[in-house]
């Protein structure tokens, strides 16, 4: 199924894995990062989908994250200049929506990604409301991580969330939230120390 999704986001076959929902995806992604150093800041706005903000407020903060919360001034947009100013050399993660669920406002994702990369931060782009409504190209955006789902504009059912991780970043991320399908030999049912696949399926659980 991931290979069916891949061309919709400009990804190659084998680069997209399927998951239960975006909230669990975000929790799994958070588990890949350490928030104990000076680079522990997470930047997002009050226009994000509540379920995602709950995951960051509870799970990421519990792991040591410092949340920088940007408030919309009009309930429609997130000021780009404030977002860019908030992303600094202490920023670890920038989890943002491509299209805001409340207002359909399209964020300038490429500029945010470029600023994040300039200071060494990682962007998790939620494309739930953009895939199926507008062109999305992970290569052109040079996005680190993209999540989304088929429930809305791809006219699918529940349980169809998807994940893209930039190939050069993939093996640098080791999720603590994991499972047997992320093992390189899942059907050998080996008990003991976890080993991770090197492909997109290393993020399965």
What are the functions of these language-model segments?
Residues 1-205:
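Pyridoxal 5′-phosphate
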């Amino acid at each position: 199924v991931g290979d069916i999704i891949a061309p919709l986001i400009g990804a190659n076959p084998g680069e997209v894995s399927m998951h239960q929902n975006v909230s669990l995806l975000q929790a799994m992604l958070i588990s890949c990062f350490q928030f104990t150093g000076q680079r522990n800041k997470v930047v997002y706005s009050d226009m994000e989908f509540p379920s995602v903000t709950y995951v960051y407020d509870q799970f990421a903060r519990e792991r040591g994250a410092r949340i920088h919360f940007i408030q919309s001034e009009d309930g429609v947009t997130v000021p780009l200049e404030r977002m860019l100013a908030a992303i600094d050399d202490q920023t670890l993660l920038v989890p943002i929506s491509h299209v805001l669920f409340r207002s359909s406002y399209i964020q300038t994702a490429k500029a945010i990604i470029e600023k994040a990369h300039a200071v060494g931060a990682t962007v998790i782009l939620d494309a739930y409301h953009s895939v199926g409504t507008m062109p999305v190209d992970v290569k052109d955006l040079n996005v680190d991580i993209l999540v989304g789902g088929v429930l809305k504009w791809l006219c699918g059912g529940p349980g169809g969330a998807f994940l893209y991780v930039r190939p050069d970043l993939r093996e640098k991320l080791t999720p603590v939230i994991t499972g047997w399908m992320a093992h390189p030999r899942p059907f050998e049912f080996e008990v003991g120390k976890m080993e991770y696949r090197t492909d997109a399926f290393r993020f399965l659980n």
